[in-house]
Design a protein with these regions (language model features):
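Compositional signal for N-terminal targeting/processing segments
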Residues: 1-262
Length: 262
């Protein structure tokens, strides 16, 4: 597997998009912080995309997998399925990006392709991720590119703030002992027709200010989010006026408009 990363030299102020939300205008970038494989997230996401009417959809996923997106609507391409990335000279170094029919990312792909809307993955290329793993290393949960702290259901549990589990912290603040139950009540079993995404982004933003980041995960997440912002700026430079960004909820505050510095 080979890939070339070309940093985009985009001035933070190079794209001027003024809007008045109070007047009903929509921002040039809307971020939809989802939970991977969440049926409620998928349902709310499709409704939000229909409302926003984006002219570009950027999805958290390996940017070098963009050529595969054209197969999403192919006959027989039915989830569950997964993207597989591996180093050609050491195939044991591999990573998977799985999708179910109720995965928000899968629904976002279908939404865009069925409407001839530009769609692309916006996360670090798989080649860049795999290249950082030591030779001979094999995939494990700590290195899973698609699992961040807000997402993998099997690792969510009530823990302390210092252990950096955002869903558990928010659940505890809301009076829940079980973060799974809290998220289910908030999003997955949500009956309210209003979008949950602004609330999710605000909550994650406050939580990130309190919790901060440190260690290896912080370096990795900072690098990923900087790359995703580059892809958003590139879409705006191409003249896109409504860019929908579908990403794990933890990343949403760092990708919302106006964009933070690169």
């Amino acid at each position: 597997m080979t890939s070339t990363l070309s940093p985009l030299a985009v001035d933070d102020h190079g794209v001027d998009h003024d809007f008045d939300r109070a007047a009903g205008e929509r921002p040039p970038v809307e971020v939809f912080g989802i939970r991977h494989h969440g049926p409620g997230s998928a349902r709310s996401l499709v409704a939000a995309l229909v409302d926003y009417q984006p002219d570009a959809v950027l999805i958290e996923g390996p940017a070098d997998a963009d050529p595969l997106l054209r197969w999403v609507l192919a006959d027989g391409m039915t989830p569950p399925l997964a993207l597989l990335g591996y180093a050609t000279d050491r195939p044991q170094t591999a990573a998977f990006w799985p999708y179910a029919v109720f995965s928000p990312e899968w629904q976002a792909m279908k939404y865009a392709l069925q409407r001839d809307v530009e769609v692309a993955f916006c996360d670090l290329p798989a080649a860049a991720v795999l290249a950082r793993w030591p030779r001979g290393a094999t995939h494990d949960d700590d290195d899973e590119p698609v699992q961040t702290a807000d997402e993998p259901a099997e690792t969510l549990r009530p823990i302390s703030l210092e252990q950096h589990d955002p869903l558990a912290v928010l659940a505890q603040a809301a009076g829940y002992d079980d973060p799974e139950r809290w998220w289910d009540d908030l999003v997955e079993s949500r009956l309210d027709s209003s979008s949950p995404f602004p609330m999710i982004t605000e909550a994650m933003g406050e939580l990130r200010m309190i919790m901060g980041q440190d260690g290896r995960d912080a370096e990795r997440e900072t690098r990923r989010e900087a790359y995703m912002r580059q892809q958003i700026r590139a879409a705006l430079k191409r003249g896109r006026e409504r860019v929908a960004v579908v990403c794990g909820a933890w990343h949403a505050p760092m990708l919302r408009w106006p964009l933070p510095p690169a």
